[in-house]
Amino acid sequence: MALYEHIFIARQDVSQQQVEALTEQFSNIIKEQGGQVGKTEYWGLRNLAFKVKKNRKGHYTLVNIDAPHAAVAEMERQMGISEDVLRFITVRVEEHETEPSAMMQSRGDRGDRGDRRGGDRFGDRDRGDRGDRGSSRFGDRERPRRDDNSDGGQE
C-alpha cells in the first residue's frame, strides 16, 4: 500500500465538531477499502489567499493515509461531492512525518529564521562615496548632442 498526505479545507461556516465528523467520515471510507489512517491534525480556521466558492476562510485538516489507490480515489470522489469541502489535495510520500507538522509547531519552535535582533543591519549595503561616477543631480549630467543638419530621421 502507498503512503499519502491528504489536506482538505472545509467551509468557514461549519463548526469544528462538524469538521471532525467529516474527517471521521472520510477516514471510515479509507478503512472500509482496506487502508489505515495515521495521524490527523486539525489546523484550525485560517484565511484563504483568495475567495474559494465565496469563502474567505476555511478549516484546514491534515490526514496521513496508508491505503491502496482505489481507497484514496473513492475518498476524493466523496469529497468532490460534499458541499462542505472547498478544496483538497492528496500527495504521495515516501514516509510519514512522526513529529507534528510545521503548521502545528509554534512560531518560535520552527527555527526557520535567524536572529533578527541587533547587529549591523545595513552593513552589507554600504554605498561609500560616489567616486568618479559623476554628479548625483539629474540636471548636471551631460546631454547627448543632436546634429543640427539632421531632419529628424525623415528623408
From Swiss-Prot:
One Pfam family it belongs to: Ribosomal_S6
Key words of the record: Ribonucleoprotein, Ribosomal protein, RNA-binding, rRNA-binding
Cross-referenced SUPFAM superfamilies: Ribosomal protein S6
Superkingdom of origin organism: Bacteria
Any one GO BP annotation for this protein: translation
GO terms for MF: small ribosomal subunit rRNA binding; structural constituent of ribosome
Biased composition (Basic and acidic residues): 107-149
Gene Ontology cellular-component annotations: cytosolic small ribosomal subunit
Chain spans, region Disordered: 94-155
Family per record: Belongs to the bacterial ribosomal protein bS6 family.
Function: Binds together with bS18 to 16S ribosomal RNA.
Record-given protein name: Small ribosomal subunit protein bS6
Organism: Parvibaculum lavamentivorans (strain DS-1 / DSM 13023 / NCIMB 13966)
